[in-house]
């Protein structure tokens, strides 16, 4: 390995979210070697002293994650509903301790009562089947997006995945300006968490959702669409495919959903009127 390449790897392994472990290659099972692996830790979101959910995530940018999750799951309406936040270690992972306004905490407790007695959670924040795909307020049609700008953005999405470049184990979510420039990207071992981090950061910074789109390196599931729409995102681009429920929810809430995004290629599932070529 060249010295410059070794230096680059050392720089990346010093960031949060990567750890070296001993492993063996198929062609040399007799001699172990060190390699970089993405960290995955349990992260509990604790609201006013009550644990609400535990998610598996990369251990960085957790304040953005907690804010984005709180917004995209409808726990809060704006960052002002959170009075304070601390990330603290626990016995088996990390806790994000969040201080909610009294009004929002009362609403959360009502939701938790409906969750009482369940032994598992397939979709976090959902109490009953009727809430799956429940439409959010329909999104406005405020912008046009030139699909020709997508190609350059796709080439640069990997720039927001330093851990992913080293380990091959993260998803990315980034905000794409109408010019095709990517800003405010985040990565995580979980695709939903990467998106929540992006939503949280832009909301914290007071950025508008009307001039641009979200680009994710993963498939577009129902939750990715629902989270985006809850925060006011009008256009969601995904590198992989969309699910049927994602398409149904996007159609109902007026979100433009585009999948199979590759240079020179894209599949538009819903509301193509926001797009030009």
Swiss-Prot record:
Pfam families: FdhD-NarQ (PF02634). One of its GO terms (molecular function) is sulfur carrier activity. InterPro entries: Cytidine_deaminase-like (IPR016193), FdhD (IPR003786). It is found in: Cytoplasm. One of its GO terms (biological process) is Mo-molybdopterin cofactor biosynthetic process. Belongs to the FdhD family. NCBIfam families: fdhD_narQ. This is Sulfur carrier protein FdhD. It comes from Escherichia coli O6:H1 (strain CFT073 / ATCC 700928 / UPEC).
